[in-house]
């Protein structure tokens, strides 16, 4: 393709699209730029594989540190395992892109987005989402697009499109909305307890901007002389489907109407029907068209049976307004919770149950040094003081699988629950702990990420974290058949799997803190989104009320096994003194006291130990080392060593001075040992600090009141 460049004036900024310049062998490629941010996005299609029953789409987003003018750390000096942010951005691109491919498409598709230059004024993620749509169109892949995404921020009372990092940090909203010509297709947001009306207005505001980007893509396709590919779906043999419908429809409908069945019981009953069909087909002659259709591939029978089950479940919801467990459309499953379910060695724990979904969250309080360093990110010098990790073991759905490292799904769910809690965490100045919550999904039947939000709240309150408000969450679903739309509250697994939407909303009684909407259809109107958001509020508040019956306030004390933190400020110029050459001094204090010391560049020193007395001892040493001395100050100290001309006294932790023999008494002293011995407590006064920083002490001219005060202060410091 010949080189082509198009500039779009968008919200006061230019977005530049360069086609045909880079990656000429990719199916489609575009370099999308705004400011000094540049993202190369490619889309490539390969022939499909036989026997698969899903779209093999892979989306990868990567960042190169050269984009920010940096060289990677480590021995290899090369980018290694992708940081969490790039995994989340890969998901951000995938989620609005995937629903727009035809359901019948089985070709291997790969979209790769590579940030090649980074401008701190222009985040690259939403550019990558829009670029993925453009690359797909250029690659002539069947696609129900175009699709585009923008970020919406809220600074003061004003919504802004594609805010800078600084504006995101200062604002109360960070919302990404993606859409197609058919409506909104994906929303993801973190918010500072914003009311529902503000979120709905922000989505509407963002979608208007998305429409402008969609129009620009259509113009680009026309200018390139391309057409949006709409391949006809392959013909589907209805033989097997008709056979199963004739023999199993009544039984499937009967099972779906048995509302008292649990998920395992319902699955087992449906499996019996499916197995009976399989047995009947196996008894047919080998040349029978039905048997041939069922054995065309190993998944033909199972997938056809699933599609028929899906049809009847959806019709039951649309026609009867009742769900497979008998609930009304807006009804939440039974909720229960507990705190303190694990021994006190665990700093805080919460168990949350909603229907057959069960999540156990455990909270650990750490020191500032436990914060997660994000230096592998293009945004440098960042760290996280709150971490949430989500685990989804196979036994949670009754399966046996190898245990592996967290995948994209686990990382995404963990990040969403983390985002939901961030706005209610106490300020660092009030609660300097680093906080980690791990949510273990012990049983899954839908909405485990929102179960993790609820479990996290319970665990934090049990750990004594003074959160501003408790947070709860609920997942909403959707069934859309033609013009008939049904919004479902608190979806369970089968409704998520067979439905058209998964809309997770978390927040407090004051407003929304996080939401994430994913679609399986090509777009949704704002009216339906608004209905889902308002319906989610009722569910959230119902769940929150149940949680508050378990624990209504954070505990007033942390676990006895949590570290005790003491924070002091020192002159930043004294940091080197405390650390010492090669860290010798600070290591010595740690070894002597058993406390851990963290020092920040501004002179904030955090000292931690499970035993508070150890922390106090380390604090006193640091304070003594960094305390400004004045001539005439009086201290109680101990003699540490003796030399012929005087005695050395440690009068503050880590700080020594010398008493010359002439200053030991108001009479002539023949030998130092005649007056003091090593280990003796003595009252001394700072006589002089010479130009080399040496401290000269005296025992002369000390008033009895000064001596008494010094002894009292020394007792406290010990």
From Swiss-Prot:
Keywords of this entry: Cytoplasm, Magnesium, Metal-binding, Nucleotidyltransferase, RNA-binding, Transferase
Inducing stimuli: Repressed by radiation.
Signal peptide: none
Residue ranges constituting the KH domain according to the UniProt record: 563-622
Subcellular location field: Cytoplasm
GO MF annotations in UniProt: 3'-5'-RNA exonuclease activity; magnesium ion binding; polyribonucleotide nucleotidyltransferase activity; RNA binding
GO CC entries: cytosol
Catalytic activity: RNA(n+1) + phosphate = RNA(n) + a ribonucleoside 5'-diphosphate
Entry keyword Nucleotidyltransferase: yes
Positions of the S1 motif domain: 632-700
InterPro entries attached to this UniProt entry: ExoRNase_PH_dom1, ExoRNase_PH_dom2, ExoRNase_PH_dom2_sf, KH_dom, KH_dom_type_1, KH_dom_type_1_sf, NA-bd_OB-fold, PNPase
Enzyme Commission number, as recorded: 2.7.7.8
Residues that, per the record, bind Mg(2+): 496, 502
Pfam families to which the protein is assigned, alphabetical: KH_1, PNPase, RNase_PH, RNase_PH_C, S1
GO biological process: mRNA catabolic process; RNA processing
Essential cofactor(s): Mg(2+)
Subunit details: May form homodimers or higher order multimers. Interacts with RNase E (rne).
Reported function: Involved in mRNA degradation. Catalyzes the phosphorolysis of single-stranded polyribonucleotides processively in the 3'- to 5'-direction.
Family of this protein: Belongs to the polyribonucleotide nucleotidyltransferase family.
Name of this chain's protein: Polyribonucleotide nucleotidyltransferase
Organism expressing this protein natively: Nostoc sp. (strain PCC 7120 / SAG 25.82 / UTEX 2576)
Taxonomic path: Bacteria, Bacillati, Cyanobacteriota, Cyanophyceae, Nostocales
């Amino acid at each position: 393709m010949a080189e082509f460049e198009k500039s779009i004036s968008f919200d006061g900024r230019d977005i530049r699209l360069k086609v045909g310049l880079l990656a000429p062998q990719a199916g489609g490629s575009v370099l999308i730029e705004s400011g000094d941010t540049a993202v190369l996005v490619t889309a490539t299609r390969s022939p499909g594989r036989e026997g698969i029953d899903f779209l093999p789409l892979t989306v990868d987003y990567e960042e190169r540190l050269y984009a920010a003018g940096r060289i990677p750390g480590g021995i290899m000096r090369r980018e290694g395992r992708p940081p969490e942010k790039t995994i989340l951005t890969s998901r951000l691109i995938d989620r609005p892109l995937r629903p727009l491919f035809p359901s019948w498409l089985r070709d291997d598709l790969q979209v790769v987005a590579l940030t090649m230059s980074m401008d701190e004024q222009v985040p690259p993620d939403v550019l990558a989402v829009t670029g993925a749509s453009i690359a797909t169109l250029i690659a002539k892949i069947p696609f129900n697009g175009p699709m585009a995404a923008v970020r919406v921020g809220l600074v003061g009372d004003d919504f802004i499109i594609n805010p800078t990092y600084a504006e995101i940090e200062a604002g109360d909203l960070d919302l990404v909305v993606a859409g197609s010509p058919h409506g909104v297709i994906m929303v993801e947001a973190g918010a500072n307890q914003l009311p529902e009306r503000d979120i709905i207005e922000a989505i509407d505001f963002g979608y208007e901007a998305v429409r402008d980007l969609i129009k620009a893509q259509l113009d680009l396709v026309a200018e390139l002389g391309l057409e949006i590919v709409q391949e006809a779906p392959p013909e589907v043999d209805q033989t097997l489907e008709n056979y199963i419908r004739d023999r199993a429809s009544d039984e499937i409908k009967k099972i779906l109407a048995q509302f008292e069945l649990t998920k395992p019981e319902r699955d087992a009953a449906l499996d019996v029907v499916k197995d009976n069909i399989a047995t009947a087909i196996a008894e047919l002659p080998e040349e029978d068209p039905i048997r041939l259709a069922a054995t065309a591939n190993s998944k033909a029978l199972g997938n056809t049976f699933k599609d028929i089950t899906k049809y009847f479940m959806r019709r039951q919801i649309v026609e009867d307004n009742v769900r497979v467990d008998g609930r009304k459309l807006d009804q939440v499953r039974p909720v229960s919770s507990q705190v303190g379910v694990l021994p006190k060695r665990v700093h805080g724990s919460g168990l949350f149950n909603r229907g057959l979904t069960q999540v156990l969250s455990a909270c650990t309080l750490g020191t500032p040094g436990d914060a997660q360093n994000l230096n592998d990110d293009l945004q440098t010098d960042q760290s996280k003081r709150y971490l949430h990790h989500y685990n989804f073991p196979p036994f949670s759905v009754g399966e046996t699988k190898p245990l592996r490292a967290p995948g994209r799904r686990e990382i995404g769910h963990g990040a969403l629950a983390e985002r939901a809690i961030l706005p209610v965490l106490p300020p660092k100045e009030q609660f300097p702990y680093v906080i980690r919550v791990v949510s273990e999904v012990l049983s899954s039947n839908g909405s485990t990420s929102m179960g993790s939000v609820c479990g996290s709240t319970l665990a934090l309150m049990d750990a004594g974290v003074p959160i501003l408000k408790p947070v709860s969450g609920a997942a909403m679903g959707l069934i859309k058949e033609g013009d008939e739309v049904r919004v479902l509250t608190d979806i369970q697994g089968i409704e998520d799997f067979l439905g058209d939407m998964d809309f997770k909303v978390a927040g407090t009684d004051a407003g929304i803190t996080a939401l994430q909407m994913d679609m399986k259809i090509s777009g949704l109107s704002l009216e339906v989104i608004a209905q889902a958001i308002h319906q989610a509020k009722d569910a959230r508040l119902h769940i929150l009320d149940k949680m508050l019956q378990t624990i209504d306030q954070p505990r007033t004390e942390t676990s006895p096994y949590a570290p005790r933190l003491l924070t002091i400020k020192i002159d930043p110029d004294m940091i080197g003194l405390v650390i010492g050459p090669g860290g010798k001094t600070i290591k010595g204090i740690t070894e002597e006291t058993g406390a851990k010391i963290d020092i920040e560049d501004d002179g904030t020193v955090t000292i931690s130990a499970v035993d508070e007395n150890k922390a106090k001892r380390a604090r006193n040493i640091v304070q003594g080392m960094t305390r400004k001395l004045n001539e005439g100050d009086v201290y109680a100290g101990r003699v540490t060593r003796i030399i012929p001309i005087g005695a050395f006294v440690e009068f503050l932790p880590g700080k020594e001075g010398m008493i010359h023999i002439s200053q030991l008494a108001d009479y002539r002293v023949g030998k130092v040992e005649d007056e003091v011995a090593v280990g003796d407590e003595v009252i001394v006064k700072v006589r002089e600090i010479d130009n080399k920083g040496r401290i000269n002490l005296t025992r002369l001219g000390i008033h009895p009141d000064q001596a008494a005060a010094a002894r009292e202060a020394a007792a406290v410091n010990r």
